Amino acid sequence: MQGMIHLYCGDGKGKTTAAVGLSVRAAGAGKRVLFAQFLKDGSSSELNVLRALQNVEVACREQNFGFFKAMDGQTKAAAQKAYSALLEDVMRKSADGVDLLVLDEAVAACNHGLIEEATLIDFLRRRPETLEVVLTGRDPSQHLLDAADYVTEMRKRKHPFDRGIAARRGVEF
């Protein structure tokens, strides 16, 4: 089966949730899943379930670098090093029998210069023929849009955050 590239983007809620759902579906079908998270510290609730699934490996960096806008130069350099290494690691692992690779928030990591978009695009072009890939994040470049076979845009129409309600564990993270 030819692998496809999925891009879940937009300013609405549900990008990671959709990627998790596809991961569960693939694992349930006996497929091997590698779920990598960028810009998150590994504490999101969905990872507890994914880590418990037999065919799923979770890859993330457990350091919390904070929000990109608040990073000083030293913190940004450390985040860039950590996330570039994460991308290299999952690219290498994906050649070893992985059926589905999720790169959660890879789009945002590219947008902030924490991973090289050219490296990601090159990987997407050279990936194993049967590897299905999911990318998530806001504001993908035209290069990423062009590389994708599926583009699904989640659009925010209304969100509790706009009323000052903070993210809730088990719902938003």
Feature annotation, model-predicted:
Residues 139-173:
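Phosphate-binding/switch region of NTP-binding enzymes
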